[in-house]
């Protein structure tokens, strides 16, 4: 009996720590056009991820090396792409994936697929990253070095937002996973594009490499959670049906 009680208590402790409450903020109850999930349904990035690398650690040295590597690419074609990738607003996510997907993902050409991507954007970019971002409030590379990003549009706003994990990367990777499910024939191109969106954050100086790596983990968790949501399931099926018609 004592052993059973000990196991139960241990399990209760794990459950509490893994499914800790997400800090208050927007969710499907306040912005249903950008979320499918409630705060209580989202994964807890603070419980899932290790702390970000400390300044002076081996892992932080890698972050610094990747920052310098990315900075050298800013005046190249890849750097130009990174600057474009910084803007995911106003259909930016859908536009970013259209070429890799093989079809234009617009409200006109593929409204159901476009709606799916738009509606899940903050489940990945906000809910899945919120608790770790708010806890650690990690300084971003551009603020750490005092060097402007490759696209300064959101620089002032994001200087007050934690760097770890990367919200943009989470959006990009989650979108890539879902689009790969809709169009598996193009999965390699789609996933590569999703990976590139994350690396663009390093090149631009908005994020450290470890921010990006961590974001891909929470994005995968967010997509798994979304698959248990009835409204997401319905819209995903509509997107798949729409794609089947596009292929004909």
UniProtKB/Swiss-Prot annotation:
- Its predominant location is periplasm
One Gene Ontology MF term: acid phosphatase activity
Q: At the top level of its lineage, which domain of life is listed? A: Bacteria
Q: What class of enzyme is it?
A: hydrolase
Name the Pfam families for this protein.
PAP2 (PF01569)
PROSITE patterns tied to this protein: ACID_PHOSPH_CL_A
Q: SMART domains given for it?
A: acidPPc
Keyword Signal present in the record's keywords: the answer is yes
Disulfide bond annotation, renumbered to this chain: none
Transmembrane segment boundaries: none
Q: Which key words tag this protein in UniProt?
A: Hydrolase, Periplasm, Signal
**Region forming the signal peptide:** 1-20
* Compartment annotation: Periplasm
Enzyme Commission number(s):
3.1.3.2
**GO cellular component terms attached to this protein's record:** outer membrane-bounded periplasmic space
- Catalysed reaction per UniProt? a phosphate monoester + H2O = an alcohol + phosphate
Which portions of this protein are annotated as coiled-coil regions?
A: none
Is Hydrolase included in the keywords of this UniProt record? Answer: yes
- What protein family is recorded? Belongs to the class A bacterial acid phosphatase family.
Q: What is this protein called?
A: Non-specific acid phosphatase
């Amino acid at each position: 009996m004592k052993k059973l009680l000990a196991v139960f208590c241990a399990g209760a402790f794990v459950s509490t720590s893994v499914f800790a409450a997400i800090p208050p903020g927007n969710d499907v109850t306040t912005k249903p056009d950008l979320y499918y999930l409630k705060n209580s349904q989202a994964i807890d990035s603070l419980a899932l991820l290790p702390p970000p690398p400390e300044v002076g650690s081996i892992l932080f040295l890698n972050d610094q090396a990747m920052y310098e590597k990315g900075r050298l690419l800013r005046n190249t074609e890849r750097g130009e792409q990174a600057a474009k990738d910084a803007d995911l607003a106003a259909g930016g996510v859908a536009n970013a994936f259209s070429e890799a997907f093989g079809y234009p993902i617009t409200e006109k050409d593929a409204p159901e697929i476009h709606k799916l991507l738009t509606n899940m954007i903050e489940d990945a970019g906000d809910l899945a990253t919120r608790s770790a971002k708010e806890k650690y409030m990690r300084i971003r590379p551009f603020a750490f070095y005092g060097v402007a990003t490759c696209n300064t549009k959101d620089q002032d706003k994001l200087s007050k937002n934690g760097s770890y994990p990367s919200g943009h990367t989470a959006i990009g990777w989650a979108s890539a996973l879902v689009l790969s499910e809709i169009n598996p024939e193009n999965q390699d191109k789609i996933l590569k594009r999703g990976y590139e969106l994350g690396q663009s954050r390093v090149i631009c100086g908005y994020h450290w490499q470890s921010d990006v790596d961590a974001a891909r983990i929470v994005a995968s968790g967010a997509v798994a959670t979304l698959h248990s949501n009835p409204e997401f399931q319905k819209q995903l099926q509509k997107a798949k049906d729409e794609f089947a018609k596009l292929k004909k």
